[in-house]
């Protein structure tokens, strides 16, 4: 008689919700949204951390850089 080895069940992977709502536009003027994707030091967070798609990450990077040039966002956060 064969003995059956019980294997642990694999957990199903659920898609995590994207941090950007479908109606929200990635725009350099939307400073509140852009601040969510910048670290405390002022660096742009990676796609892996923010769970953005590649297309969204490119648009976010361009928007953050434009906002920095227009002095809407700081290049470096020096607040201690």
Curated annotation (Swiss-Prot):
Localisation per UniProt entry: Plastid, Chloroplast
Keyword Chloroplast: yes
GO BP of this protein: translation
Region (Disordered): 1-24
Gene Ontology cellular component terms for the protein in this record: chloroplast; mitochondrial small ribosomal subunit
Record key words, sorted: Chloroplast, Plastid, Ribonucleoprotein, Ribosomal protein, RNA-binding, rRNA-binding
Top-rank taxon, per record: Eukaryota
TM ranges: none
Pfam family, one: Ribosomal_S18
Main localisation: plastid
Biased composition (Basic residues): 1-19
GO MF terms, alphabetically ordered: small ribosomal subunit rRNA binding; structural constituent of ribosome
Key word DNA damage present: no
PANTHER family the record matches: 30S RIBOSOMAL PROTEIN S18, SMALL RIBOSOMAL SUBUNIT PROTEIN BS18M
Similarity section: Belongs to the bacterial ribosomal protein bS18 family.
Subunit structure, as described in the record: Part of the 30S ribosomal subunit.
Identification of the protein by name: Small ribosomal subunit protein bS18c
């Amino acid at each position: 008689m064969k003995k059956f080895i019980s294997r642990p069940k694999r957990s199903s992977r659920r898609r995590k919700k994207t941090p950007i709502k479908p109606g929200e536009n990635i725009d350099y003027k939307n400073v509140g949204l852009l601040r969510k994707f910048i670290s405390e030091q002022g660096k742009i967070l990676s796609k892996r951390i923010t769970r953005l798609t590649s297309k969204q990450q490119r648009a976010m990077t361009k928007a953050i850089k434009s906002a920095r040039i227009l002095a809407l966002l700081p290049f470096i956060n020096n607040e201690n």
